[in-house]
Swiss-Prot record:
GO molecular function: phosphoribosylanthranilate isomerase activity
EC number: 5.3.1.24
Keyword annotations: Amino-acid biosynthesis, Aromatic amino acid biosynthesis, Isomerase, Tryptophan biosynthesis
Pfam families: PRAI
Catalytically driven reaction(s): N-(5-phospho-beta-D-ribosyl)anthranilate = 1-(2-carboxyphenylamino)-1-deoxy-D-ribulose 5-phosphate
Pathway entry: Amino-acid biosynthesis; L-tryptophan biosynthesis; L-tryptophan from chorismate: step 3/5
Naturally occurring in which organism (per UniProt): Pelobacter propionicus (strain DSM 2379 / NBRC 103807 / OttBd1)
Protein name: N-(5'-phosphoribosyl)anthranilate isomerase
A GO BP annotation: L-tryptophan biosynthetic process
HAMAP family listed in its UniProt record: PRAI
Encoding gene, per UniProt annotation: trpF
Annotated family: Belongs to the TrpF family.
């Protein structure tokens, strides 16, 4: 069954709502430019109150390696997601499993994948002004080609209206949603979360990676 990550968690209420709806993982954004940004202290407080078996993922953009590792330790993060221009050797220095995000403009955007040794790749829509959370989709044919050879987490403009088509097209290991289940930036919508996860979990995918 496909894995679902709800990203941009900023408060305990939304975190528990996502867990109760069936989310496999929660994402915390450690990037001050984002309207969904949290401090390590805020994230740690939420994570301490989560039930077991829920994966916690920290999103970073071009932060120093020491800051990433310190934050991961302080918050008890399970996985680190890197959304900037972090090089393969940088990723190797992270003391957690790593998901490397790539912003997809065309097929050439995936060429760096062969150089990385990471747990998974997250594919998001390319934007000249943001490293994620834009609400934009991209060419899923490109993602499908990548998913045939790699463990892929699909992101970018996903909503309850298009998630079934996305899963059937790409066959990803997991899907990642943030703005698609929000009432406002940083505040989740209960109905949207439940519907998104329900449809994602009910949609048949051939992915078993």
């Amino acid at each position: 069954m496909i894995k679902v990550k709800i990203c941009g968690i900023t408060n305990l209420e939304d975190a528990l709502l996502a867990v109760d709806a069936g989310a496999d993982a929660l994402g915390f954004v450690f990037c001050e430019a984002s309207p969904r940004s949290v401090t390590p202290e805020q994230a740690a407080s939420i994570i301490r109150q989560l039930p077991p078996f829920i994966q916690t993922i920290g999103l970073f953009v071009n932060e120093p390696l020491a800051v990433i590792n310190q934050t991961a330790d302080a918050c008890g993060l399970d996985i680190v997601q890197l959304h900037g221009e972090e090089a393969p050797q940088f990723c190797a220095g992270v003391k957690r499993r790593v998901i490397k995000a790539l912003r997809v403009r065309d097929e050439s955007s995936l060429e760096p994948m062969t150089s990385y040794r990471v747990s998974a790749f997250l594919l998001d829509a390319w934007s000249p002004s943001a490293h994620g959370g834009t609400g934009r989709t991209f060419n899923w044919d490109i993602a499908a080609g990548a998913a045939a050879k790699n463990r892929i987490v699909l992101a970018g403009g996903l909503t309850a209206d298009n998630i079934a088509a996305a899963i059937r097209k790409v066959h990803p290991y997991g899907v990642d949603v943030s703005s698609g289940v929000e009432a406002a930036p940083g505040k989740k919508d209960a109905v949207k979360i439940r519907e998104f996860i329900r449809i994602a979990k009910e949609t048949r995918s051939e992915s078993t990676r």
